[in-house]
Amino acid sequence: DPSLVRDYLAYYMSRELGNYASKTEYCEVVINGDYKGLYVFQEKIKSNENRVNVLKIEATDNALPNITGGYITKADKTTGGDPVAFWMDETKFVHDLPKPENATPEQTQYIEAEFNRMEDHAYDDDLEDGYRTIIDVPSFVDFMLVNELCSNADVYQSSTFFHKDRGGKLRAGPVWDFNQ
C-alpha cells in the first residue's frame, strides 16, 4: 500500500466498532544516518486479554468442554511454512492458536467441524437453531463492513482471521492485512 493508510484506517474503524484490531504506529526509519522511509509498525495477532481474548487451548484439551476453545484460525494462502489444518472448497485454513505443531487431531477435527456447521447453516431460515447458534453475528457484520468499505482484496480467502473462546461462538476477526 503506497499510501500507508489502508491498514491504519481499517484497524481504526474496527476498534471504533468495539473490536480488537492491531495497534499501529507510523515511524520513520533511519539507519546509520541513511533515511530508509516511512513505515507502519503493527502488533502481531495473538491471544491475551488485551488482544484476542480467548483462553489458550492446551494439548490436553481434547474432550468437551475444554476442546471448545480457544482457537485463532486463519484462512490464508500458505507458502510452505504453515501446515494446512483443513480445507473448505479452495480455501486453506491454518492454526494460529494452538500453534500448528501443538494442535492435536481432535482439536483440528473440532474446529473444522465448527466451520462446517457454519457453512451448513449459512442459508438457514431458522433463526433460533440456525447460524445464530454457531456464530457471533455482530462480529461477522463488523468484520464484513470494515473489509468491504476498505475494499480488502485479500478478505475471505487470505489473511482472514476467526477466533473462538471456550464455550463461545465462532467470531470473525480480527481484521488484518489491507495493504493490497
Predicted regions and their residues:
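Phosphate/dinucleotide-binding and metal-coordinating scaffold of catalytic cores
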Residues: D1-Q180
